[in-house]
Design a protein with these regions (language model features):
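Generic alpha-helical structural signal
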Residues: 27, 59, 63, 88, ...
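Active-site beta->alpha loop and helix N-cap motifs at the rims of alpha/beta catalytic domains
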Residues: 2-145, 303
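Catalytic alpha/beta core domains of metabolic enzymes, predominantly
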Residues: 126-132, 140-244, 250-251
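Short secondary-structure capping/turn micro-motifs that flank functional sites
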Residues: 49-50, 110-111, 172, 198, ...
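C-terminal alpha-helical cap/extension of soluble enzyme domains
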Residues: 3, 8-12, 36, 205, ...
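Alpha-helical structural signal in soluble globular domains
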Residues: 36, 60, 64-69, 93-97, ...
C-alpha cells in the first residue's frame, strides 16, 4: 500500500455568515495549498468542524474537493461519526467519488475504552470502502480514547486488509516511533503535530504528515522537511522554532480551529465563522492576534496565494 510522502493539509470548512457551507472558495483553496508545497487534504476532520456538519454537507464538501482538486493532489475524507451507519454511508460515498483514502477518529460519544472496541469500530467503517486506504485518526484529547496505538496495530494486522496506518496527533514521540518501527514500517504513521516535525524526523519518521497550521504556515513546515533532507539542520531548527511561535500565538485565541481560521481572513482569504458552540473571535481579539503575528514577521513567511 502506498505511503504518503510530504505534508497533507487539514482544511477549514468555509461558511457563509449565516453558517451555511460555502463551496465557492474551495478551488482557490486547493490551488493555494498545492502552490505552498502541500500534497493533499484531509477534509471534514477536526479543523474542518466535521462533527458539526450534516452528512449531506460532508458529502457535498467531498464532491467539491474532488471536482476542483489539482492533478496528483490527494483527497482523504474523514468519515468518523457518532453514528456508525452514517460513517459507513460517508465511506461508501467517498469510494464512489474515487478519493485517495478515508480516515476516522474514535467517536466522542460513546467513549471507546478498549482496543477491541476500537478495532471493531475501525473494521466496520473500513469494510464499507474496501478499495480505499483507511487511516485511524488518533487524537485522544478530542474523544478520550487514550489507548496504546502499538496494540491497535497488532490487533488490526491481518484483520483489516485496507488499514493503512495512523494519523498520530498525540504528544508521545516514543509511541509514535514504536508504531513506525512495527514490522519494519508496515504501517504508514502520519505525523500529526506541527510543533514536533523536526524531532520526529530525527527519529527517522515524519516522511508523511497531516497538519492544521499548514493552512497558513505550510510553506515553512514543508521547509523543515526539505532542510532536513538537505542536511541544513540549523535552517530546519529555525523553521521549527518559528512554527512553534505561530502555534503559541493561536493558543492565545482558542487554538487552530478558531484562531487559525481567523488567520486566513487576515491573509485575505476569509472562510467565514465557526459553528456553535465554538466562540468566534471578536474584532478586538483579531487585531490583538494580528499584532502578535506581526511581531514574529508571520505575514512575510506565511502561505502565498
Amino acid at each position: 500500500m502506498e505511503k504518503i510522502i510530504g505534508l497533507i493539509d487539514a482544511p477549514f470548512t468555509p461558511f457563509y455568515a449565516n453558517g451555511d457551507v460555502n463551496l465557492e472558495p474551495i478551488e482557490a483553496y486547493a490551488k493555494m495549498l498545492q502552490k505552498n508545497g502541500l500534497k493533499g487534504v484531509f477534509i471534514n476532520g477536526s479543523s474542518g468542524e466535521g462533527y458539526m456538519l450534516t452528512t449531506e454537507e460532508r458529502m457535498l464538501l467531498a464532491e467539491r474537493w474532488v471536482a476542483v482538486a489539482p492533478k496528483d493532489f490527494k483527497i482523504i475524507v474523514h468519515v468518523g461519526s457518532c453514528c456508525l451507519r452514517e460513517s459507513r454511508r460517508l465511506a461508501e460515498h467517498a469510494q464512489k467519488l474515487g478519493v485517495w483514502g478515508i480516515g476516522s477518529m474514535a467517536p466522542p460519544f460513546p467513549h471507546i475504552g478498549r482496543i477491541e472496541e476500537l478495532v471493531k469500530y475501525c473494521e466496520e467503517i473500513a469494510s464499507a470502502a474496501p478499495e480505499l486506504p483507511f487511516y485511524y485518526y488518533h487524537i485522544p484529547a478530542f474523544n478520550g480514547a487514550y489507548l496504546p496505538m502499538l496494540d491497535l496495530l497488532k490487533a488490526v494486522d491481518g484483520r483489516i486488509p485496507n488499514f493503512a496506518g495512523i494519523k498520530y496527533t498525540f504528544e508521545s514521540l516514543y509511541e509514535y516511533n514504536q508504531c513506525r518501527l512495527y514490522k519494519n514500517g508496515k504501517y504508514d504513521m502520519l505525523h500529526g503535530q506541527d510543533e514536533t516535525i523536526l524531532p520526529s524526523l530525527a527519529q527517522g519518521g515524519a516522511q508523511g504528515g497531516i497538519g492544521g497550521t499548514t493552512n497558513y504556515n505550510g510553506k515553512e513546515l514543508v521547509g523543515i522537511i526539505e532542510a532536513w533532507k538537505n542536511g541544513d539542520i540549523e535552517i530546519a531548527r529555525e523553521k521549527q522554532n518559528f512554527a512553534q511561535e505561530v502555534i503559541s500565538v493561536i493558543c492565545h485565541y482558542r487554538g487552530n480551529i478558531v484562531g487559525g481560521k481567523r488567520i486566513m481572513k487576515l491573509m485575505g482569504f476569509d472562510l467565514g465563522p465557526n459553528r456553535t458552540p465554538f466562540r468566534n473571535m471578536t474584532d478586538e481579539e483579531e487585531q490583538a492576534m494580528k499584532k502578535e503575528l506581526e511581531a514574529i514577521n508571520f505575514f512575510e513567511r506565511c502561505n502565498q496565494f
